[in-house]
């Protein structure tokens, strides 16, 4: 319930933050919230990808022992049908499609995480179009993943709900970025843009 409420608030802020009718203080608060949402999202996604998700594709010896143990405990506790099948420790169906999505996460998304994290910290406006492209791509890839978790056989209601609560933010937050980027010409109002082009436009 808390996750759903947070998601609803984030989407509402993303949609409403573009409106000219908002007073400057309210608009500033919305922008600050979305900026910090992005910083936290990308900053936490980097270690999650490198230490957890990458284990589905790369050999075990490249990961520290604590990371391997953490994933083992996660699979044992929540019986994640996707990660367990990807790691060869169970699963009821062929998960090659899931491995292909993990590959795109490592090859495409991971480099973008560093770029986006820098852009959000430094308030770089050039991130808007790449952010929309990223958000649309990731939102689409999360649909089959959530569908698999929702319909997987042999998964108890409690574990299914817990897994969905963990995975759903990785659909919703990118979707919020899409809405935000499409509704705003400048994401970080009053922030620093790339090369100061906004300032030159005002003075020309």
What are these regions (language model features)?
Residues 169-180:
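Hydrophobic cores of alpha-helical transmembrane segments in multi-pass inner/ER membrane proteins
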Residues 109, 133-148:
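Hydrophobic alpha-helical membrane segments
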Residues 113-128:
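Juxtamembrane helix-break-helix junctions at the cytosolic face
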């Amino acid at each position: 319930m808390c996750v759903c409420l947070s998601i609803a608030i984030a989407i509402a802020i993303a949609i409403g933050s573009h409106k000219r009718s908002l007073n400057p203080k309210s608009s500033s608060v919305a922008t600050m919230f979305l900026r910090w949402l992005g910083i936290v999202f990308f900053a936490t996604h980097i270690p999650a990808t490198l230490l957890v998700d990458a284990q589905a594709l790369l050999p075990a010896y490249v990961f520290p022992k604590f990371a391997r143990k953490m994933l083992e405990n996660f699979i044992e506790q929540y019986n994640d049908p996707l990660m367990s099948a990807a790691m060869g420790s169970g699963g009821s169906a062929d998960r090659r499609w899931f491995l292909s999505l993990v590959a795109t996460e490592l090859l495409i998304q991971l480099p973008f995480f560093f770029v986006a994290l820098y852009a959000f910290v430094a308030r770089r406006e050039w991130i808007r179009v790449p952010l929309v492209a990223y958000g649309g791509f990731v939102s689409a890839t999360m649909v089959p993943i959530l569908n698999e978790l929702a319909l997987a056989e042999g998964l108890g209601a409690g574990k299914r709900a817990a897994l969905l609560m963990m995975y759903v933010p990785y659909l919703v937050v990118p979707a919020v970025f899409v809405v935000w980027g499409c509704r705003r010409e400048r994401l970080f109002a009053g922030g620093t843009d790339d090369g100061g082009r906004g300032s030159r436009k005002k003075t020309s």
